[in-house]
Amino acid sequence: MVCALRDTSGVSVLERKCAEQMLEWFETRKGNPPKERLADFGTLLSRSMKAANMEGQPLKLASGQTKDVKRLHRDFRNNFAHFVPKSWSIEKAGLPRIVRAAIEATDLLIHNERVDRQLSGNRKRRLARQLKTIREGLMS
């Protein structure tokens, strides 16, 4: 999402207040640049779904897919990244659907014009191959 949203100034992926401070600094160049703070995942996801924020097509996911992507981030990614000792149980039946939604979002975003310009042909092929491998793994 960050690559697809990032504009030439880099402020489009920042928290709103941070982006405002950065734009002001660009104008004045007084002092040190403000500390950059990336917008949270939910904000970036929302921004990527709005045409005004994207070059080319916005991210288009069904409401169920959007819910699954948010759940993957909130319930799985955050709990793994910010580990707190506790018991875990992962709903095996719903996990392939949730991962498919994330793969679909990734596939749509890597075809965005901004991302396309940033990736070499080799990287594009590797990403396409990895997404295909994951999809095939989900079907087996």
Question: What are the roles of these predicted feature ranges?
Answer:
Residues 2-63, 83-86:
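Short non-catalytic regulatory patches outside canonical folded cores
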Residues 37-53, 64-71, 75, 79-140:
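Polyanionic, low-complexity intrinsically disordered segments
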